[in-house]
Amino acid sequence: MSLTLTHPEYLTLTGPDGQPHPGADQDWYRDPWQRRAGCGPTAAAVILTYLSRVHPALAPLAPAGDRADGEFLDYMEAIWSYVTPGARGLDNPESFTLGCLSFALSRGCLLDGQVLKIPRRDKGTRPTAEACRDFLAAALAADCPVAFLNYSSGDLPNLDSWHWVPLIALTEGEEVLLCTILDGGEEKVIDLALWLETSTLGGALAVVTPDPLPEEG
């Protein structure tokens, strides 16, 4: 099984250097603390920008001006005010979804948020690879990127610990669950099944989706 977003090209964004990048980079922030702790709001900015382009009701989330050359950093700064890291970064997945929902409300849009927690190895039963696959598949089928929070990277050499990244595609193979992520202005592929087996601290998958207005009676 393979699933991807309908318009991955919408995830190509212009950085402060004037060059196109897959996704965004927290190092674009101006402040040193933001550059250190800004993976969560950076992931949120990328995800909300994509939603604004593919779901017409969510267009106000990121109007074209927010995506213009040289303007995306200002959009990241706007997101920071809602998806705001604390002393330990943005370590609560519910804070991520609630921040996105609050930002959406500030622009007249409604979102719904869902979280699949993956506890640390010694604190309870983890969701299976199949459960993670189903969560990801439902989000991608709805044309919504997924935010992946990773507290410890396990045996994955290309994934930072204590880190948020947007997840934009998935391919299931025999004993592997290959996921495409955007990280540091680059596209990478990780094996989520291997991460589930080897990460000691776990993490979470989070998704925000359009919440349709109730129909008028």
Go through each PLM region and give its residues.
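Active-site-adjacent structural segments surrounding the nucleophilic cysteine of cysteine proteases
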Residues: 1-99
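Mature extracellular "passenger" or substrate-interacting domains of secreted, surface-exposed proteins
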Residues: 33, 40, 103-106, 112
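Short, amphipathic alpha-helical segments
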Residues: 38, 90-94, 126-130, 142, ...
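Non-transmembrane alpha-helical segments in soluble domains
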Residues: 48, 101-104, 137
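Short, flexible/disordered intra-domain loops and linkers
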Residues: 64, 122-126, 157-160
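Internal catalytic-core helix/loop-beta-alpha segment
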Residues: 106-143
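Active-site signature of cysteine proteases
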Residues: 130-134, 139-142, 149-217
